[in-house]
Amino acid sequence: MYDYIKGQLTKITAKYIVVEANGLGYMITVANPYSFTDCVNQQVTIYLHQVIREDAQLLFGFHSEEEKDVFLKLISVSGIGPTTALAIVAVDDNRGLVNAIDNSDITYLMRFPKIGKKTAQQMVLDLAGKFVEAPKEESSKPPKAKQQGNEQLDEAVEALLALGYKATELKKIRAFFEGTSETAEQYIKSALKMLMKG
């Protein structure tokens, strides 16, 4: 099992990033690949969780140990796999998640992709009181330069599809942001907030 990887970030796609370490390129699935845009060709530390299946070995990556801890707690719940847990982590609203679990807010939890009523109830049963709320880390990232709006929006929609959101949901999101100019990362963050509001 791997705890973390240190290496050069060489590639970003809508579904994963590639980190080169010791001459090997590791394909790492992350919640929001575009949050790493400023790190391309730089040294990064990515916290890892490895999933070994009959047909594949998968690496899931996180910005921090806290983010990884949330992911690990989520996949301990029956009915939540790594992809669904990653979609929940992508929303980047730990306070909202913890409040929903601790207050049995099933409706809020069901807004996440692939979370039905039974799974939401199971989340409450399994995770209530298990999260220690950490203060949100101040971002040390410099502000990103805005790029071509439509291309960035396309990349954001592709990343949201990879997280399990439906094309019909994203059609409204695309229409809302059409004509604006943001980075893919910002589109994803804004879209996730909108999707969670319902």
Swiss-Prot record:
Gene Ontology biological-process entries: DNA recombination; DNA repair
Region feature Flexible linker, mapped onto this chain: 143-147
GO cellular component: cytoplasm; Holliday junction helicase complex; Holliday junction resolvase complex
Residue ranges of the region described as Domain II: 64-142
Location of this chain's protein in the cell: Cytoplasm
CDD domains linked: UBA_RuvA_C
Keywords assigned by UniProt, alphabetized: Cytoplasm, DNA damage, DNA recombination, DNA repair, DNA-binding
Xref: Pfam families: HHH_5, RuvA_C, RuvA_N
Family from the record: Belongs to the RuvA family.
HAMAP family, per database record: DNA_HJ_migration_RuvA
Stated name of the protein: Holliday junction branch migration complex subunit RuvA
Native organism: Streptococcus equi subsp. equi (strain 4047)
Gene: ruvA
